């Protein structure tokens, strides 16, 4: 709604990008983490759906859906994106595309990732975090339930409970800090840490900046 409002809508506080910088940065990082590929070039198109939003003149809880009276709002022009489409080129020559939206009704925090190979497609939906959809060319498609006994060791290391015991969003932070604390206990950082570092944070900032450059110039931009 045009009454949805928080500090991220104000560029002087949050910067010149919103949907990409706020939630797209996480998706772009996940893509590189899972695939092992690096994004080398981007082409972006931004869209601001609500060009004017109503800023509450009194406190209102984020995500609450509560409405104030008309006189309790001030009209504010919006200069950051509600929605973005980004084409990606990877360092191995493959392509990808990303859609990020903060104006999709009913989608509070969904992350969907789909990777298509030469023979199979794998899809993950964060709203069903214990399932992976596997698309096949010459047999029935499959839904794989999370089960440490069926996973590679690298994946099993990120699972705490046995199959049939759900794990979800809150467990991701737990798994992250297990790796961080293990490095602290060892007294040194691994040569190739699985957890994000300052270098990863810098890279995501750089990618977001290049995406901004692309939407402004309407051209492909190298990372």
Region locations from a protein language model:
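Glycine-rich phosphate/pyrophosphate-binding beta-alpha loops
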Residues: 25, 99-108
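Beta-strand scaffold of nucleotide-dependent catalytic cores
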Residues: 97-100, 124-125
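A general structural signal for well-ordered alpha-helical segments in protein cores
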Residues: 27-28, 177-181, 208
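Predominantly a Rossmann-like dinucleotide-binding segment in NAD(P)-dependent oxidoreductases
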Residues: 1-77, 132, 218
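C-terminal capping/lid region of NAD(P)-dependent oxidoreductase domains
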Residues: 212-223
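C-terminal glycine/acidic-rich active-site capping loop/insertion
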Residues: 33, 47-92, 114, 119-195
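Glycine/proline-rich active-site loop of Rossmann-fold NAD(P)-dependent oxidoreductases
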Residues: 37-38, 78-80, 94, 107-111
């Amino acid at each position: 709604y045009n009454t949805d409002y928080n500090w991220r809508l104000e560029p002087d506080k949050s910067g010149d990008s919103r949907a990409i910088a706020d939630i797209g940065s996480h998706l772009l990082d996940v893509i590189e983490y899972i695939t092992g590929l690096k994004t080398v070039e981007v082409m972006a198109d931004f869209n601001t759906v609500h060009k004017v939003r109503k800023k509450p003149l009194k406190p209102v809880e984020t995500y609450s859906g509560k409405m104030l009276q008309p006189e309790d709002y001030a009209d504010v022009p919006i200069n950051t994106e509600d929605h973005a489409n980004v084409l990606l080129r990877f360092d191995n020559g493959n392509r990808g595309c990303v859609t990020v939206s903060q104006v999709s009704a009913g989608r509070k925090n969904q992350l969907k990732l789909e990777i298509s190979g030469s023979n199979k497609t794998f899809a993950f939906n964060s709203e069903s975090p214990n399932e992976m959809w596997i698309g096949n060319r010459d047999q029935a498609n499959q839904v794989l339930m999370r089960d440490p006994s069926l996973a590679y060791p690298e994946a099993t290391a990120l699972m705490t409970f046995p199959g049939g015991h759900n794990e979800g969003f809150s467990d991701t932070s737990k798994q992250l800090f297990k790796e961080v604390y293990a490095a602290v206990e060892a007294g040194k950082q691994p040569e190739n840490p699985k957890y994000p570092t300052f270098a990863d944070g810098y890279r995501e900032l750089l990618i977001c900046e290049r995406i901004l450059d692309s939407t402004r110039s309407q051209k492909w931009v190298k990372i």
